[in-house]
């Protein structure tokens, strides 16, 4: 009788152990396993911030010690979620081995003069101000999710105008032109005038149903031009982050999330505008004695994105 009771107790203990192990495994995976919603390859150089937490895998089971503020290569980004917490991780390579680190723990090296100017200034940006107008038609995006899949960049093409004058003109002529964008950006403002939950009508029928769009008035000093570009990069990063999208340049097959109006004309059609190519290149050459292209802008967007 006593032997049977001891056997039953052992069985109970074994069952308790098994149940505990299962619960522990479920708890561990819910708290430490990261689900990757998207990833994309890059070729960047960065510096580890002081106190950066470096891991040997995305599951973050084991911390790794690397020299502080060491230079590393960034070869991939991962958009992850764990326990309802969304974070972006960078896969870095140091001495031939890959590690993982939160993007807030690295600082990208900027090759372009304008990007470097902004980086050394701490990546400044204006706050987003909303003055949503009710006059613009609200139509949903044509994506399966109902959300935008990227951002299209415009410049106004007009000299010596301001955000206020451009917005006034767009509103006054909307009934006849049926053209509008979501947001206007200059060196001091990020002014959102149309709800980004709905499509804009500024880049032709092949782009409008898919992208958030913004316009940039022209700036004429080095500081104001750089700050406008910085605000534009911040806003682009904000929209992409808000919609859980990667930072990738638009491609001929329609992929990618960061587009100029000129790229829409070349790759998607339905429009023939070439902005902001000339505005960027002319201003960069005149004000900074350098060049500025969509590749430089994507690099800057990633820097702002990494801080979010």
Task: Label each PLM-derived region with a short phrase.
Residues 205-214:
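Short coil-to-beta-strand
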Residues 85, 146, 160, 176, ...:
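Solvent-exposed, acidic/flexible segments
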Residues 157-160, 219, 263-266:
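Acidic glycine-/aspartate-rich tracts in secreted/extracellular proteins
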């Amino acid at each position: 009788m006593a032997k049977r009771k001891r056997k039953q107790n052992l069985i109970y203990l074994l069952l308790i152990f098994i149940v505990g192990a299962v619960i522990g495994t479920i708890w561990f995976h819910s708290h430490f396993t990261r689900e990757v919603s998207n990833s994309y390859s890059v070729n960047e150089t960065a510096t580890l911030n002081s106190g950066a937490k470096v891991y040997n895998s995305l599951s973050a089971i084991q911390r790794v010690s690397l020299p502080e503020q060491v230079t590393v290569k960034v070869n991939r980004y991962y958009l992850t979620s764990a326990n309802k917490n969304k974070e972006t991780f960078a896969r870095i390579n140091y001495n031939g081995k890959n590690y993982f680190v939160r993007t807030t723990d690295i600082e990208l090296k900027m090759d372009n003069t304008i990007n470097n100017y902004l980086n050394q200034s701490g990546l400044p940006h204006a706050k987003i101000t909303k003055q949503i107008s009710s006059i613009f038609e609200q139509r949903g995006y044509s994506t399966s999710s109902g959300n935008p899949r990227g951002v299209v960049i415009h410049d106004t093409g007009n000299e010596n105008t301001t955000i206020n004058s451009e917005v006034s003109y767009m509103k006054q002529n909307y009934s006849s032109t049926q053209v509008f964008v979501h947001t206007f950006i200059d060196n001091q403002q990020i002014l959102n005038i149309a709800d980004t939950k709905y499509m804009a009508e500024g880049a032709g029928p092949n782009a409008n149903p898919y992208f958030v769009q913004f316009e940039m008035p022209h700036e004429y000093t080095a500081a104001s031009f750089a700050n406008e570009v910085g605000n534009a990069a911040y806003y682009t990063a904000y929209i992409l982050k808000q919609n859980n999208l990667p930072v990738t340049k638009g491609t001929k097959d329609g992929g990618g999330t960061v587009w100029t109006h000129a790229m829409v004309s070349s790759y998607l059609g339905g429009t023939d505008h070439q902005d902001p190519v000339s505005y960027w290149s002319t201003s960069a050459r005149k004000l900074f004695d350098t060049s500025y292209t969509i590749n430089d802008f994507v690099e800057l967007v990633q820097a702002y994105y990494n801080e979010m």
